[in-house]
Each structure stands twice: as C-alpha cells, then as structure tokens.
Amino acid sequence: WFADIIFPASAQAEKLGTYTNSNRQVQLGRPVVDMPGDARQDWELIVELAKRCGLDWNYENVSEVYTEMAGHMESLDNIDWSRLERESSVCYPSFASDLPGEEIIFFSGFPTASGKATIVPTDLLPPDELPDEEYPLVLTTGRVLEHWHTGAMTRRSSNLEAQEPIPVVSMHPRDAKIKGFAKGDWVSVKTRRGEVILQLKFDRDVTQGMLFMPFCYNEAPANFLTNPQLDPYGKIPEFKFSAAKISKVEKPK
C-alpha cells in the first residue's frame, strides 16, 4: 500500500458536501449512513492537516468551505448553500437567486458581435512516428468496460476481475488470419520502446492494421510501449498512436 500515514476518511454515502459535474450541475450530497469509528469528513481532515502545517484555518462546517469557494468562483454566483439545501441541485450559470440555472448555455446567442460562435479551424499534425517495414502496425491503448484507469480499485472486485481477468491485445480477425494466429495465442507486442508478452484476442471492432491494448494491467504494462512524445500545444503524450509489430511466442513459464 506504500502509505506512511492513513487518514480515517469517510465514504461517499457518509459525506455532506457538493458535487459539480461537467454538465454544470452543482449538487448537494447528503449522508445516508453514519460514519463508522474514527472516520471523519474530508474537509475536517484537510483542515486539521493545514493547522499542523501552521495555517490559520478555522472552518466550522462544510457550508463555510462552500461559501468561500462561491466567493471566488463566478460560476457559483447566486448559488448559495441555503439554495442548495432547498433545491438539492442547480445548474450554473444562474443569473439570479430566484431564477433557475441555465441548463442550455448560449441559447440566446454567444457573447460576440454577431451573436454567433467563433469557430477557429486547426491544422492537423501527423503522428510522431508512422508504421514502416519494421513496425507495420499501429498500437493504440485505452480502457476496458470493467476496469477503471489502472484498475487500482476495480481489479480488487472479484466480479469485475472475473469478467476481464487477464491482459490481452486485440486484433482484427483478418489481420490475425494473415499472420496465422489463433485466438488465445501468446504473442509479443513490440515498439521502439519495449516489449510486452500477452495473449491475443480477436475483435472486429479493431480497425485492420491496428492493435489495441488496455492499460489497466500491471503485469502487461501498455505504457512500456507507448510514445512519450508530447503534443506541442496541449503537452499530451502520444499514447494513442505508436508504430508496433506483433509475433507469436511460446507461453511464458
């Protein structure tokens, strides 16, 4: 677990506080069960930690924390704690405390001279590396339905782990037939950065000429293979496009 200190935090169903999602909804979450033992609300743990670091934090409850947030975030204008207690959920922006939030933004136009959106086209940049004779395929990575991100939580669920228990690389059946592969074969996936050995899965949803690997299995780390080259503007690594090759190998001992 690699932790020097473990705080007795509360679970989601034990918390009082707000959740703000990408749909611009500010929702008040209320506890439905009591916290067990020495468990405490997240804000209480953070306040106590801040005090021990020498900060003069004196919040008495979660509503004080929210009120300070609202004072610095224009998106929370007219959405105070008492309103959330009454309505449970409010969309921002809300232009008055007695008006509903704007569920559809820019419905009456955009803040431009014409009232229309300004759309700026962009020039697409080629990938850092393209397939060639040595690495003729494109490797892309992503998630599987059953495991979230690195699987730190979902792989501890026996139900989810039973559905996706082992790492696989997915390939279109036509590509596999050309190479003489069978379902479940052990294969080596190589890029210019490394090699991972795992089993093969046929998947017609994978485009011909491509391979797909999930990145949630530490025993077959997909990011040993991916390209760390950064996008020049967003500074995002090129995890979704790497030149790769695949070959059949013996089952590891």
Language model segments and positions:
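Flexible glycine/proline-rich, aromatic-decorated loop/lid segments
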Residues: W1-P31
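Short, well-ordered loop/turn elements at secondary-structure boundaries
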Residues: W1-A3, A113, D132-Y135, E164-P165, ...
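Long, low-complexity segments enriched in small/aliphatic residues
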Residues: V62-N159
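Pocket-edge structural micro-motifs
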Residues: A9, R30, V47, T112-S114, ...
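Long, contiguous, secondary-structure-rich segments that constitute the structural scaffold
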Residues: P36-D38, D42-E87, T150, R156-S170, ...
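Structural motif
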Residues: I5, P136-V138, V168, M210-L211
